[in-house]
């Protein structure tokens, strides 16, 4: 496989079609043409992935032996990777009922996170218990569609989603959230496209959006015709309308705050290849217009945006240059920023000559960002076998992510 920016990727397979090796352009350039990612199998089940450059990214897969407890026979029971490991436990229908995630933040700091789940007879998730003890419960209708979600933690129950309604085609037409806000949705019955949405709270309309499309489903327009009422700041000590005699001339009166959101309109235009070429709109009295142009290979050539606010950040004109013969469709310069790439097409250096700043990036064999140096301030990232970021470190701070959700520092 050969890509104009990512270079050549060479793969080998066994007689059963299983991937055995993968050699990328960057590995070939920086190590050798023998330095490929290798894959090992156990009866056609992937058992190991080895990396020639970042050896600690090694991934191993362990499967349950005959007679294994917790219905693990023949199923994946453990995955070990650079971030730690994850063990799986199964129910009678093969559903995952428990996972134990061990995250190696550092050599001296290993943290464990346990998730459990229960299912109904249709193998639908009924409850999920999170590492902090929160239990989330799902309700379904006769068609198996989610109708409610509630949370219980430390004996306190909170409603996340109170009600969901569907039409005969399975489209969501109504939702009522735990905070009382309600949304109704309208669809184009011929193309099943969303045409409008009305959001209300406490009987007041907050947002009413309408969508317009062209014959190939590109969005041509998006409008909101409602500006919500300004919320009132309550009376009381420390606020407007103080009762201690220090509230000034407005003491004892409610004072309105600025409303959130407001009416807006956006319109879009496309060329014959369905590429966005124009956009314009207005929100909170400020309008904008944007134009783009493209080259023969679909690469952006120019982007010009103008706003009524006069903001330098909001109005700009960018020209895209493509001066790197090894990456013909990757920009070598956008405005004041100059880009350098590795052989796989990942950006490794971004220099801004107007601000005299630079960002340096490092990537692993799977093209995952492993380090970012922003003017000398470095962040590092560790991933699991699925490619999800699990650990982010910045200076002395290290953050952990499980299933994409932050778990704190």
Label for each model-derived stretch:
Residues 27-34, 68-71, 104-110, 228-261, ...:
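Intrinsically disordered, low-complexity Ser/Thr- and acidic-rich flexible linkers and loops
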Residues 1-6, 21-28, 48-55, 75-88, ...:
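Beta-turn initiation residues at beta-strand->coil junctions
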Residues 34, 38-63, 68-69, 206, ...:
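Short secondary-structure transition motifs
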Residues 11, 37-39, 61, 88, ...:
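A residue-level detector for well-ordered beta-strand positions
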Residues 210, 215, 221, 232-235, ...:
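Extracellular beta-rich repeat passengers
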Residues 35, 57, 84, 113, ...:
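Beta-rich catalytic cores
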Residues 3, 14, 41, 71, ...:
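Short, acidic, Ser/Thr-enriched surface-loop or helix-capping motifs
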């Amino acid at each position: 496989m050969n890509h104009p920016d990512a270079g050549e990727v060479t793969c080998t397979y066994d007689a059963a079609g299983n991937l055995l090796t993968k050699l990328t352009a960057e590995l070939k350039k920086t190590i050798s043409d023998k330095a490929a990612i290798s894959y090992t199998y156990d009866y056609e089940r992937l058992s190991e992935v080895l990396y020639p450059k970042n050896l600690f990214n090694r991934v191993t897969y362990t499967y349950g032996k005959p007679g294994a407890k917790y219905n693990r026979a023949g199923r994946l029971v453990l995955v070990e990777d650079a971030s730690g490991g994850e063990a799986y436990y199964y129910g009678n229908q093969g559903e995952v009922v428990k996972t134990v995630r061990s995250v190696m933040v550092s050599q001296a700091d290993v943290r464990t996170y346990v998730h459990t789940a229960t299912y109904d007879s249709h193998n639908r998730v009924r409850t999920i218990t999170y590492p902090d003890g929160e239990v989330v419960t799902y309700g379904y209708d006769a068609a198996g569609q989610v109708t409610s979600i509630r949370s219980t933690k430390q004996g306190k129950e909170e409603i996340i989603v109170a009600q969901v309604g569907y039409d005969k085609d399975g489209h969501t037409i109504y939702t009522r959230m735990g905070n009382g806000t309600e949304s109704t949705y309208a669809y184009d019955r011929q193309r099943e496209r969303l045409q409008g949405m009305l959001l209300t709270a406490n009987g007041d309309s907050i947002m009413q959006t309408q969508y317009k499309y062209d014959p190939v489903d590109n969005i041509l327009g998006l409008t909101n015709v409602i500006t919500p009422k300004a919320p009132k700041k309550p009376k009381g000590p420390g606020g407007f309308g103080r009762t201690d005699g220090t509230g000034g001339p407005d003491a004892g009166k409610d004072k309105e705050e600025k409303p959130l959101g407001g009416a807006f309109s956006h319109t879009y235009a496309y060329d014959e290849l369905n590429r966005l070429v124009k956009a314009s709109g207005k929100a909170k009295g400020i309008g904008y217009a944007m134009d783009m142009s493209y080259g023969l290979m679909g690469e952006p050539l120019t982007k010009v945006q103008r706003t009524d606010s006069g903001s330098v950040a909001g109005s700009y004109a960018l020209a895209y240059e493509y001066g790197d013969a090894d990456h013909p469709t990757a920009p070598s310069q956008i405005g004041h920023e100059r880009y350098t790439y590795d052989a796989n097409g990942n950006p490794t250096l971004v220099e801004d000559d107007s601000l005299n700043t630079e960002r340096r990036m490092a990537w692993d064999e799977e093209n995952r960002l492993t380090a970012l140096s922003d003017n000398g301030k470095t962040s590092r990232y560790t991933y699991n076998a699925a490619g999800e970021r699990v650990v982010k470190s910045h200076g002395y701070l290290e953050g952990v992510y499980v299933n994409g959700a932050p778990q704190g520092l």
